[in-house]
């Protein structure tokens, strides 16, 4: 089967790789000059199935009000004047109940755990290198309330059989030695020893090269204008004056998927803006050894070979990609507070990206009401974590194989008023 994949971020490239492995003839099209040059370029770097959680959670609405008045708040909202933004935020609020949170987190952990298994198999088979580490991840708490609140997440972890360790302040240094110097600031931590880290952009670039060896064709610097219909099916994708034809099409355009599919399939994927800095390591003993997540600032601090990546925060501000100095100051504050002297933040590079977020936090992977149109988008802050599993799952669905995990609640049909009701989404 001839397949066109639209988008060459980590989700698009993994889709192409697994489709090619399944025997399909794959072409990837992207407007950028190479793979992983947008949202996948400088993300936080962690592969964290156990921390796969929706932003829509109990207590978040009240926290959001408080964050409006805080300088270093992890969430910011600026109305962009669109009805879609208001609809998306309303649907997100509806998912902030305990029952919806449990369902959504369960879905996310299921896919994320499977994705890590797929990544490990891929690594064993290909030997792909991306400055990866398998030292687990550590969430640190600054208040007793945060520490006590971890019980809800632990219940979900136990249900999913995810190994974990709840650590006291004195035990944190066992996982991250440099935290010994600042343990008095912390009330404890939740460690997931099965989590991993790595450079997403490096991984995507090298996987694209492996995909090319399997016969995948990459067309960069190519405009992606619209899908052309023939009856109830996609005939091709319009790229400037050219119509690129195929048997099936995969939309993996991240935050741009919603507008691209407008009038065809309505999906609730909204850009959630995030930031990162990448600083050179200047003192090994004061630097992290894996990933540390600061629960207060919602920031992840990740160790690469000779760099520290600090990323996080969320802004609901539309497609604004301006770099706000105040956000850089928050990232620097967090890493310098937990790992003083570990990295030189004065020499850090500053970046922003738009994560494609659904209101329930779960990505959209699989079939659509259009017979030969498939989606792999909406992974939010977990595109790197979920990429391999999403790509393998999609390849199985498109190849007529039974996926290794439950997949029906991951497709766009969970938003539709009825199967086939492409213009009657439940969130509208």
UniProtKB/Swiss-Prot annotation:
Protein's pathway: Amino-acid degradation; D-alanine degradation; NH(3) and pyruvate from D-alanine: step 1/1
Its GO CC terms are: cytoplasm; plasma membrane
Family named by the database record: Belongs to the DadA oxidoreductase family.
Record's protein name: D-amino acid dehydrogenase
Catalytic activity, EC? 1.4.99.-
Q: Which Pfam families match?
A: DAO
Tell me the organism. Answer: Paraburkholderia phytofirmans (strain DSM 17436 / LMG 22146 / PsJN) (Burkholderia phytofirmans)
Please list the residues that bind FAD. 3-17
